[in-house]
Amino acid sequence: MAKANVRVRKKVKKNIAEGIAHVHASFNNTIITITDRQGNALSWATSGGAGFKGSRKSTPFAAQVAAEAAGKAAQECGVKNLEVRIKGPGPGRESAVRALNAVGFKITSISDVTPVPHNGCRPPKKRRI
């Protein structure tokens, strides 16, 4: 059987100086997405994708490892300045921001964009442990 010609596209290297880091910290996981100013994703990482499973995904250390992974991938695109937007009440909020700072980004602003309902949906029942 003849082998089909497969063209491999060379990855286009973007050169973007400043971006936005979206940190979504839920109770179960932490998702870090680094985008450009228009919202196009440059890199992303999660606690689960960093090798943590189960309840270890929701630890601050898992968020730190995920933020470092997303940060290093974004630095390859040339990002130097970051605006951080944090969403959610999870335990990985602060550690993700500290990790992005430690990777070498200059953080211009940190804002909390957690959605607050104007008495919308009924919240989940209280946990009984």
Swiss-Prot record:
Source taxon at top rank: Bacteria
InterPro entries per UniProt: Ribosomal_uS11, Ribosomal_uS11_bac-type, Ribosomal_uS11_CS, Ribosomal_uS11_sf
Keyword line: Ribonucleoprotein, Ribosomal protein, RNA-binding, rRNA-binding
A Pfam family recorded for this sequence: Ribosomal_S11
Coiled-coil zones: none
Entry's Gene Ontology BP terms: translation
GO terms for cellular component: ribonucleoprotein complex; ribosome
MF annotations from Gene Ontology: rRNA binding; structural constituent of ribosome
Recorded family membership: Belongs to the universal ribosomal protein uS11 family.
Known role: Located on the platform of the 30S subunit, it bridges several disparate RNA helices of the 16S rRNA. Forms part of the Shine-Dalgarno cleft in the 70S ribosome.
Subunit-structure text: Part of the 30S ribosomal subunit. Interacts with proteins S7 and S18. Binds to IF-3.
Cross-referenced NCBIfam families: PRK05309.1, uS11_bact
Protein name per Swiss-Prot or TrEMBL: Small ribosomal subunit protein uS11
Organism: Methylobacillus flagellatus (strain ATCC 51484 / DSM 6875 / VKM B-1610 / KT)
Source taxonomy: Bacteria, Pseudomonadati, Pseudomonadota, Betaproteobacteria, Nitrosomonadales
